[in-house]
Swiss-Prot record:
Ranges in a coiled coil: none
Gene3D superfamilies: 2.40.280.10
Organism name: Chloroflexus aurantiacus (strain ATCC 29366 / DSM 635 / J-10-fl)
Keywords: Cytoplasm, RNA-binding
Protein name per UniProt: SsrA-binding protein
């Protein structure tokens, strides 16, 4: 039995908080460069994306603050740094387009999930704009209203 359940098969980690804190304009799939012990930890599901972000630096995209836990079966000398910046693999035109979008005011690159496509680890990046506090409150109010409507409809169907 697996330790965590995900909606989608092959998904190792999701950054659910990102959808709460940001308005996601678009998503893009990127490969990720990992060392041997890192890929073993990713396969074990030991990834945390909370608070992580990506940046375009010198026409390359790097993922920062993504925590990939050290692989337990390897010794302390053969392990990786859990918080090191990791290079993301994208085509040149995708990098240029992302760089143009990110230079717009208030836009950032946020990793949404890490998953496997075949045997390769992939990161889904979102081009996002930060939400204001009142936007978050509005989303919560909208969800509460939808929940109340669903309850009322269920009660009405039950009474028939």
């Amino acid at each position: 039995m697996t330790a965590t359940k995900h909606k989608h098969p092959g998904v190792v980690a999701e950054n659910r908080k990102a959808r709460h804190d940001y308005d996601i304009e678009e998503t893009i799939e990127a490969g990720i460069v990992l060392s041997g012990s890192e890929i073993k930890s990713v396969r074990a599901g030991r990834v945390n994306l909370r608070g992580s972000f990506a940046r375009v630096i010198d026409d390359e995209v790097f993922l920062y603050d993504a925590h990939i836990a050290p692989y337990e079966q390897s010794g302390k000398y053969f392990n990786h740094d859990p918080m090191r910046p990791r290079k993301l693999l994208l085509h040149r035109r995708e990098i240029n387009r992302l760089n143009g979008l990110v230079r717009m005011k208030g836009m950032t690159l946020v990793p949404l999930k890490v998953y496997f496509k075949g045997r390769r680890a992939k990161v889904e990046l979102g081009v996002a704009r930060g939400k204001k506090i009142y936007d978050k409150r509005e989303d919560i109010a909208r969800r509460d209203a939808a929940r109340d409507i669903d309850r009322a409809l269920k009660r009405a169907r039950h009474d028939l």
